[in-house]
Regions:
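Signal that preferentially marks extracellular ectodomain short beta-strand elements
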Residues: 42-46
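Protein kinase-like catalytic domain
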Residues: 62, 92-95, 141-145
Length: 163
């Protein structure tokens, strides 16, 4: 079993918390900067990688192209209201009936909404396929929310050495 990444989780969680704590100050200074880059209709490789990771972990609930489903919201709409640090916090800690946190189990206990349906977003802090690429996933979802890219697989620029 490949569990080497678990040894690094305390450090990664600490870094994630530091990121979440520092993002409001950073985002206030850089409101015009986008987490994605598009040149001649092609996205940067990080955003393309976010598309790939989104379809590996997120599309089952949030639908293809982040449009939502009958049991999970459209990320296109959500990211028009959420700041980046809020999005990261929800993905890392999960959400149960609107409350962030508490869904940190691999199989969280579902609460029941007034309609009798559970409303749970699991925490992904244990999933290296999400945690290691969270910035890329956010970049893809934000590009979709901003309508900067169309539905479907986005064409991408070549991978840069720094990516």
């Amino acid at each position: 079993m490949h569990l080497k990444w678990i040894a690094y989780m305390p450090m990664r969680l600490g870094m994630a918390l530091l990121l979440v704590a520092s993002v409001p100050a950073v985002s206030a200074e850089t409101d015009d900067e986008k987490p994605y880059r598009i040149v001649d209709g092609k996205v940067d490789f990080g955003t393309y990688n976010g598309y790939r990771r989104y379809h590996n972990s997120c599309h089952r609930c949030h639908g293809p192209d982040a449009v939502g489903s009958s049991f999970a919201p459209s990320l296109i709409e959500s990211l028009r209201k959420l700041e980046e640090f809020q999005f990261l916090n929800i993905v890392i800690h999960g959400r149960i009936d609107g409350r962030i946190g508490g869904a940190d189990d691999d199989q969280p206990i579902a609460s029941t909404s007034a309609a009798g349906e559970s409303n749970v977003m699991p925490a992904f802090y244990k999933d290296p396929n999400v945690m290691e690429y969270l910035d890329d996933i956010y970049a893809y979802a934000k590009a979709r929310s901003d309508r900067a890219i169309a539905p479907g697989r986005p064409p991408h620029l070549p991978k840069e050495k720094s990516d």
